[in-house]
Amino acid sequence: MTNLQELPSRGHLLTEQINPASQNLDQLTPLELVDLFNQEDAHTLRAIAQAREALAQTISATAARLRQGGRLFYIGAGTSGRLGVLDAAECPPTFCTPPHLVQGILAGGDAALVRSSEGLEDRYEDGAAVVGDRQITAQDVVIGISAGGTTPYVHGALDAAQGVGALTVFMACVPVEQVQRSADIDIRLLVGPELLAGSTRLKAGTATKMALNIISTGVMVQLGKVYGNRMVDVAVSNRKLLDRALRILTDVTGMDRAAAAALLERSGYQVKRALLMHWTGLDAPAAQALLDQQNGQLHAARSAALDP
């Protein structure tokens, strides 16, 4: 146990400060509480807007690494880590990515997803060990997520990632003057003090989730996983996603649902491949070969086939 006399105060951190708007939180009616939360959550949108350039840089730099065979790692503890795991877990069904491409790493491992293991965030050495355990290299991207900016586990991971030349991104909800951190890209989501003082699962967590949504979706757009605003690399793994795949085909091509079903089956249940087959008359292997030549970019593959 840390000597209490030596424990530094974190009260100066933005995420730990008292929100004057909620001084009487325990006296509010349920409706007043809902209204106050709704009012405060507007700060998350402003925080994302203020971080727009750093988010865009992260998308571009991450996509470039992934095109060269790299991977994306989200690393965090508590709510921050769980949000990284959540975003990573959504990539395979949404974009048909292999599970290793985007990985979420949480202090305490899978058990910490359902049972808080807050003490593990203090273990700098555990974060550093992740880099070796996952064989992170200079091709990879490591996004360290820490709402308060001080999590030793996250700093250990980022320091070790820098040591092997990985692209590093630091995401925190405190200003630079409160917590400084060397990283290739620095994302600050300044949502202000929480309504429940120090509870960063609230606005800080919401802004973090928004930022991760933007990053992962933006990267996948850059990698050609989207056509228009359709998830044409969707993994057809259940009835809902099968229906979505059929609707994408009918909407984009104008064919009826029966024809779309037949096309989808011929394509091996690959929507992007099916679209290219429809437009070009290619069979499934030839369509896939053309997509591979064009790095998965459907627009480019279609142009190459129709306007050689």
UniProtKB/Swiss-Prot annotation:
Active-site residues annotated for this sequence: E90, E121
Class of enzymatic activity (EC top level): lyase
Database matches in InterPro entries: Etherase_MurQ (IPR005488), Glucokinase_regulatory_CS (IPR005486), MURQ/GCKR (IPR040190), SIS_dom (IPR001347), SIS_dom_sf (IPR046348)
One GO term of the biological process aspect: N-acetylmuramic acid catabolic process
Domain SIS, chain residue ranges per copy: 62-225
A family per Pfam: GKRP_SIS_N
Catalytic activity: N-acetyl-D-muramate 6-phosphate + H2O = N-acetyl-D-glucosamine 6-phosphate + (R)-lactate
Domain of life per record: Bacteria
Keyword Thylakoid: no
EC number, as in UniProt: 4.2.1.126
Key words of the record: Carbohydrate metabolism, Lyase
Gene Ontology molecular function, alphabetical: carbohydrate derivative binding; carbon-oxygen lyase activity; ether hydrolase activity
Pathway: Amino-sugar metabolism; N-acetylmuramate degradation
Assembly mode: Homodimer.
HAMAP family: MurQ (MF_00068)
Other notes: A lyase-type mechanism (elimination/hydration) is suggested for the cleavage of the lactyl ether bond of MurNAc 6-phosphate, with the formation of an alpha,beta-unsaturated aldehyde intermediate with (E)-stereochemistry, followed by the syn addition of water to give product.
Family that this chain belongs to: Belongs to the GCKR-like family. MurNAc-6-P etherase subfamily.
Purpose: Specifically catalyzes the cleavage of the D-lactyl ether substituent of MurNAc 6-phosphate, producing GlcNAc 6-phosphate and D-lactate.
Protein name as it appears in the record: N-acetylmuramic acid 6-phosphate etherase
Source organism (scientific name): Thermosynechococcus vestitus (strain NIES-2133 / IAM M-273 / BP-1)
Gene: murQ
